[in-house]
Amino acid sequence: IVTKISFLSFEISELVKKNVGYFTQIIGPVLDVAFSPGEMPNIYNSLVVKGQNPAGQEINVTCEVQQLLGNNEVRAVATSATDGLMRGMGAVDTGAPLSVPVGETTLGRISNVLGEPVDNPGPVRSNTIFPIHRSAPAFTQLDTKLSIFETGIKVADLLAPYRRGGKIGLSGGAGVGKTVLIMVLINNIAKAHGGVSVSGGVGERTREGNDLYMEMKESKVINEQNISESKVALVYGQMNEPPGASMRVGSTASTMAEYFRDVNKQDVLLFIDNILRFVQAGSEVSALLGRMPPAVGYQPTLGTEMGSLQERITSTKEGSTTSIQAVYVPADDLTDPAPATTSAHLDATTVLSRGLAAKGIYPAVDPLDSTSTMSQPWIVGEEHYETAQGVKQTLQRYKELQDIIAILGLDELSEEDRLTVARARKIERFPSQPFFVAEVFDGSPGKYVSLPETIKGFQMILPGLLDSLPEQA
């Protein structure tokens, strides 16, 4: 009996030590919590609600403080469903921001925004935990070395080459192939890549997350027999989850990648699909918090939120982070604030075209809209640069002639222009290639094409060495 009493008194004293607040208002994922005077939690502190409601329903909700309202109240946003929460229930201030396990034990596993595993093999046993809100590296720590990151995708390697340790955006509307291209890059790069990869599913379809997981198991990037030999960590905050999860899952993925870069001094690949869902989640949260949106409807803090995520994704003298991000373009409008704000942070932009997808040319990459800061002769070399410029000039001339062809017909063009059109049509089709991840759809075995092979192919088309061949060849 004495032992039981002492144990109970210990439990009560532990509860007294905790900083507990009580819900005063619950509006969907937004929660108002009142604390004792002088006990207000800091911005970004996580609050935890555990226990049972009067109906006997188990409650386990983590939320993040977003605003200090005054009168000892804070406003927090939940990272999971708030079903079963009631006014008057207690929420414990953890005294720290959301923190997640990092390190080798996360490889081969699927985690949620809190770093909790959502797959079968049991808990993630890690001795190291990092907060998800971290500062970007100092200027003196940044690495400015320039080198090309070969992908095996012809059109990207030639016309908009990716920078090793840079940020790359795959921009396009709905259904033009962004996620397939992400999976191709994971397949082409992650298997040959010496370091590790982290993939963040930000507000995307659960089916796509499952497809990616299965694809990685098949290609042995995730090793089910020996999970410690896996090369990728997956972090998902899917479409059915509250905006608080989608808004922070990018930060969780970045935190896991930073451990491998800064502590293990490795080269890391960070895949984010889709960056627009991060913006949309921020917009939802902003509206729920009562902030006044500007004319287009996005949050007034769009630039700050995007900058705080993107500036962390960089290369330091310890290791590099190469980030490949899918950027959904609403209504195919590249001037929309979300893709426009994202593109300001990118080293290369691969733009996917609905017109090319309609023609059945995959990957449907628009060679004239796609850009890269690496397309300089002193970086890629004179031969690569001259070939790329020749391709762009031929395609640009073809684009200018299309109105004339539509009105007057091909026969009204000069001999030189007819030749340009014939070569441009070959160039338009030449970047098309079968992918390993698309074998199930078209039955064609995938092809990895090296950069020298790509340059050689275009160099044969430009001067007319292949004029005798039909377009389909």
Swiss-Prot record:
InterPro entries the UniProt entry points to: AAA+_ATPase, ATP-synt_VA_C, ATP_synth_F1_bsu, ATPase_a/bsu_AS, ATPase_alpha/beta_chains, ATPase_F1/V1/A1_a/bsu_N, ATPase_F1/V1/A1_a/bsu_N_sf, ATPase_F1/V1/A1_a/bsu_nucl-bd
Subunit and partners: F-type ATPases have 2 components, CF(1) - the catalytic core - and CF(0) - the membrane proton channel. CF(1) has five subunits: alpha(3), beta(3), gamma(1), delta(1), epsilon(1). CF(0) has four main subunits: a(1), b(1), b'(1) and c(9-12).
Binding site for ATP: G172, G173, A174, G175, V176, G177, K178, T179
Protein role: Produces ATP from ADP in the presence of a proton gradient across the membrane. The catalytic sites are hosted primarily by the beta subunits.
Record SUPFAM superfamilies: C-terminal domain of alpha and beta subunits of F1 ATP synthase, N-terminal domain of alpha and beta subunits of F1 ATP synthase, P-loop containing nucleoside triphosphate hydrolases
EC number: 7.1.2.2
HAMAP family registered for this protein in UniProt: ATP_synth_beta_bact
This protein's name: ATP synthase subunit beta, chloroplastic
PANTHER family: ATP SYNTHASE, ATP SYNTHASE SUBUNIT BETA, MITOCHONDRIAL
Lineage: superkingdom: Eukaryota
